[in-house]
Amino acid sequence: DLKNFLINIIENKYYRKDTFIKNNIYKFIEFYFLKLISLNKSQKQIHLLYENFIKKIFYLKKFNLDEEAFFIEFKTKILNG
């Protein structure tokens, strides 16, 4: 499933090694959020997290910020790893 796929990418740091994953990792993260929103009853809370992480992705790309910290936070807060 998508959750395990994202955990695998983050733990093995494939986003650094594979150009396809590097170019698409943020799309996979957005798909995961959309899946959570559609499946959960607490949509408002997840929607707020979604907006927060989308802003972080925007700033990460715009200012070339540290991806490692972003992925650790995403894994901890969203993937519960």
Tell me the role of every PLM-derived stretch:
Residues 1-81:
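AAA+ P-loop NTPase domains with strong preference for DNA replication initiators
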